[in-house]
Amino acid sequence: MAVSLFQGDGHGRSGVVFGVKDRMNFYAAVMDLSRQMLQVIRVVAGQESVIGQAALKPKLVDWHTLRVQRNTIISKDFIEAFFDGQLTLSVEDQALGLGQIGLVVRGTTSAQFDSFHAAPLYSHRPFSPPAAY
């Protein structure tokens, strides 16, 4: 999934939620431009855990892109977060399965979102039909 976002003044985080079972069980990938930090958070039974974080080097523009994808490589699930087109964070986690997606703002900041879209990632489907020989 990917979204363009503008984070307003104040202290807080904005981003996407995914793997949502309910309001007590989900993942979130959130950016905090005031601290220049990107975090991947796991919430299980209402308990928040930061499972990965990385420093950001934001471009001097108002709008930024945040993309998150979940990959499976040899039965290991990875969450990859991209900020402004660059892979910024990759974490391995299998605690939560698939679920709903959405947008999130936490703290005293405001945010504007645009061009939010999601698509399934098929890693085992061929890009072309089998050869005709």
Which role fits each region the language model picked out?
Residues M1-V3, V61-I73, D77-A81:
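Short tryptophan-centered beta-strand motifs in secreted/extracellular beta-sheet-rich domains
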Residues G12-S14, Y27, Q36-L38, R70, ...:
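Short beta-strand/loop motifs in extracellular/secreted proteins, especially
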Residues V16, A28, I51-P58, V91, ...:
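Beta-strand-rich interaction surfaces with strong enrichment in secreted/lumenal proteins
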Residues M1-V43, R106:
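Secretory/extracellular carbohydrate-interaction modules
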Residues M24-F26, Q47-Q53, Q86-V91, P126:
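Surface-exposed loop/edge segments in extracytoplasmic proteins
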Residues A55, E80-V105:
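Short, solvent-exposed beta-strand-to-loop segments that form ligand-recognition rims
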Residues D93-Y133:
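Ligand-recognition surfaces built from glycine- and aromatic
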